[in-house]
Amino acid sequence: METITQTARVFYTAQTHTIGGREHGVSRSSDGHLDIKLSTPGTAGEGTNPEQLFAAGWSACFEGALGIVAGKKHVKLPEATAIDAEVDLAADRNGFFLQARLNISIPGLDRVLAQELVDEAQNTCPYSKAIKGNVNVQYNLV
């Protein structure tokens, strides 16, 4: 197993334990805050799936990044700021892959300024940086 060289300060490490994968699986966090059932999309299963979890985590992280970028510009994000994330599980002849869209609403903010915040947040959000060049993404200011 390859080790990770720590070159930066780690702020937080999430730990989960998953059994069963996306078909009838369960996943729990070490702190007990997350305890979920997993199911394959389109089946009668009662659980969530990795795509929904990614969409929730990414949209929350991106909104946090928007707040950081806005703060640096001395701009207050409206309370009604919201993000609708869509993450597709797709396949082609090379296998499975993800593609995604973030639909970002920043009501009441000048559209040019809002777009600047969205553009800068893409380079701030750890999720966006992690998938850049690996996942086809559309960032839509709505």
Indicate residue ranges for each PLM-predicted region.
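Extended beta-strand/beta-hairpin segments
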Residues: 1-56, 63-142
